[in-house]
Amino acid sequence: MAVTKLVLVRHGESQWNNENRFTGWYDVDLSEKGVSEAKAAGKLLKDEGYSFDFAYTSVLKRAIHTLWNILDGLDQAWLPVEKSWKLNERHYGALQGLNKAETAEKYGDEQVKQWRRGFAVTPPALTKDDERYPGHDPRYAKLSEQELPLTESLALTIDRVIPYWNETILPRLKSGERVIIAAHGNSLRALVKYLDNMSEEEILELNIPTGVPLVYEFDENFKPIKHYYLGNADEIAAKAAAVANQGKAK
């Protein structure tokens, strides 16, 4: 049976991950640790014998630079890459820039967990005159006002990620190309929920660690057979737990 593999990677730790702040569409770069994570992911993929024909990422530099470091480690810096806002992190609205633990102290752990992980829960929205509104950013100049979020739930993130998967990424896999996607915690959670047919309750508890390759294997009908992380299982579990704890009061 022919098996098709897809590799997903959440960007390495960003400067705002390190500061425990809601990031969303804010274009913060990788921390030093994040660069190291991305380089380690590239080495791991190379050691495991992976190479690719095409790459996808968002229009945010923490994901773009993660992909650069991975491809550099694979000696595939030349690889064609498509960047799309549809793979951006979920937009966190008026929470963007706020410290997660301080926000939990103010509103309570459960409210922040719902904002971070609730399926259809949207954080407080931005207003269009807020400097954080994406309509002020030239990279989104070609988007319609209806496409520009003031806030997003995971459900709304799915509404942009899954059509992009079905219309753009999946056809490339079906043509036989080997694909890697470097994206974000919630855009990847959106895709994982769809691929694994997870319930709203199950996705609430899913935490994707930074900088760890996640491999999906598909059968000839492009249905997922299994998925697994590459690397040390204990280290990966610890990183996932750290993601879960970010939104708790200290």
Curated annotation (Swiss-Prot):
Give a short account of what the protein does.
Catalyzes the interconversion of 2-phosphoglycerate and 3-phosphoglycerate.
Task: Kindly provide the name given to this protein in its UniProt entry.
Answer: 2,3-bisphosphoglycerate-dependent phosphoglycerate mutase
Which HAMAP family does the record match to this protein? Answer: PGAM_GpmA
Q: GO MF annotations for this entry? A: phosphoglycerate mutase activity
SMART domains from the xrefs?
PGAM
| Binding positions (substrate) | 10-17, 23-24, 62, 89-92, 100, 116-117, 185-186
User: What EC number is given for this enzyme?
Assistant: 5.4.2.11
Organism annotation: Cronobacter sakazakii (strain ATCC BAA-894)
Question: NCBIfam families this protein is in?
Answer: pgm_1 (TIGR01258), PRK14115.1 (NF010713)
Lineage of producing organism: Bacteria, Pseudomonadati, Pseudomonadota, Gammaproteobacteria, Enterobacterales
Tell me its family: Belongs to the phosphoglycerate mutase family. BPG-dependent PGAM subfamily.
Q: Which pathway does the UniProt entry assign to this protein?
A: Carbohydrate degradation; glycolysis; pyruvate from D-glyceraldehyde 3-phosphate: step 3/5
Q: Which GO terms describe its biological process?
A: gluconeogenesis; glycolytic process
